């Protein structure tokens, strides 16, 4: 007999993020989702109901500054489950000055819900969030046209907004948008179907979240194992870290990058247990058949199949996160998987600087070779950060783009 939690486990975990312009109702939608899916604890429900009608946004607006201003500033993470699936949800800010937080929340998401106020339609920040989702290659994009109750649940309003947004998303290269008319405050089409929009025949938000395919565990993704620690034990070397993608098996021929040395996987250990195979997301230790000079920051990849690129020239799309601008000629640290190297900004496309929350393209030159994949192919080894070499502050988030 299948229990709700075991069923949720079988369906896999979906990582999702919310985004949209300020006051479009993101936190209220998340609160409604948690409330109506019975994912709210009794003490939480009592806390948000003290003034009468529950203020659902308080389920996610946890910071004092957020509560005082009535906005979401930081990224609020929520973990919940239904009988069909587990979820990790990032509720991200809407203000343009907090675009950097939206990048953080959506960078690991497999689905992003972008909210639009039905009264305002698609606005500049809506387009910015759609561009970020496209930049990050988020596999699934949902448009939630919110506050439909304030426009009389008119189908024409929903249709016009959905058409405009879908056309823009198509220009960005997004293959498909799922548009859903909702009222987060009233609960229409969040968990339960709306009684006010019988003209809509699609899924509710929760129905879509429970059934959308999780592509992160695609079996054909090449294995990538960034080495985090080297452990010496009983005259053998073991390499520890988290498998970023794909599957590693005992007996697999592997290449150590960037050195190019080759060997074979002799043993794998996950959580103290010897295994024949390890899968993406698992923390493991690996022993090779040969004693090679492998260090933290090296990357193990199969000797057969698509190989990562070993290069000192990195091109990529970026979102600048720091208050201080990023300029041509600036010296930075590039952090990629478990490796950090010195780098210099060689050029910026169509600009001489990027300021906070700007989107752009950068060309970097690193002091040492970096082992990288195209972000569109393998997100985990295609993402990078630029850091301030003086204090380690994060400056920029980037997505590597390799020559085709």
Give a label for each model feature:
Residues 3, 9, 18, 150-153, ...:
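C-terminal effector modules of nucleic-acid-centric enzymes and ribosome-associated factors
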Residues 5-97, 109:
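P-loop NTPase switch module centered on the Walker A-proximal segment
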Residues 21, 66, 105, 247, ...:
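Residue-level "contact hotspot" at macromolecular interaction interfaces
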Residues 23, 29, 48, 70, ...:
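Residue-level signature of catalytic and energy-coupling elements of molecular machines
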Residues 29-33, 44-47, 101, 125-132, ...:
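Alpha-helical scaffold elements adjacent to nucleotide-binding pockets in ATP/GTP-utilizing enzyme cores
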Residues 48, 117-118, 142-159, 180-196, ...:
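G-domain G4 guanine-recognition motif of GTPases
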Residues 85-87, 92-97, 107-130, 137-159:
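Conserved Switch II/interswitch segment of TRAFAC-class P-loop GTPases
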Residues 166-324:
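Conserved catalytic-core segments of large NTP-driven translation/proteostasis enzymes
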